[in-house]
Amino acid sequence: MQKLAIALVLGAISTPTMAQDLQSQEIVVTASRIEQEDYSDRMPAVGLRRPADFLVQAVVIRGDTRDMEQRRREIRSMLSDAIRKAQAAGVELAYGDYILTPLTLANVEDIDLRNDNRPDSERVVFLVKAKLGGTQSGEAAEAQIARYIESVPGVGRAEMDEWGDSTLSIVGPDSYRPQIAEKIAEDSNAMASRMGQGYAVEIEGLNMPVQWSRAGPGEVLLYIPYRLVVVPRP
């Protein structure tokens, strides 16, 4: 009966509206959702550890041609070339700080040019993604992205380079809520058994959105910031 009661509680939890927004969207795992949406920073011991979907590397195209119009044409031309070469290189392009949007020739103008750190220079930053999983390790994904960057020729004085460290992304983090809840139920049942007949466990916070953090070179930890409370039976 104890196991059944916990399972029924977990099954009764509906997916929050905010969680439904992330059922299928791809997010960047730079840290946890805490930093993005100001949720509680309490990370429970139980979560779902799984491979990330993509290795993500920010790249920058810089140009310093003196004439502004020519400089911008060169940067834009190289960006368009980068988009055209992505599929053949087995990578995908995207933009966004949190939720990722595919970068294509149809929306390339949505990427703004910004002033670089020198006079008469500008840059554009976007993301290159390589799939993880199967036979594709993190190291292999890094090498794939590096080869892609080398394959895109410069245009005028525009050049493309890596921009900072790589990170990970995961598609639809909130779609893993049932698997996370199952792990919580297993741990809660085990805890209840250890407490003896005089005590029960209560689970609080299961209505919170799924959160995430990086768990290893190519893995993420998905979790719900629940709270397990041991209480005496009446």
Predicted feature descriptions by range:
Residues Q2-A7:
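Sec-dependent signal peptide recognition
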Residues L10-G11:
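Short, linear, compositionally biased motifs with a strong N-terminal bias
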Residues S14-P16:
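N-terminal signal peptide c-region/cleavage motif recognized by signal peptidases
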Residues Q20-D187, S193-P234:
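Short, charged, surface-exposed interaction patches
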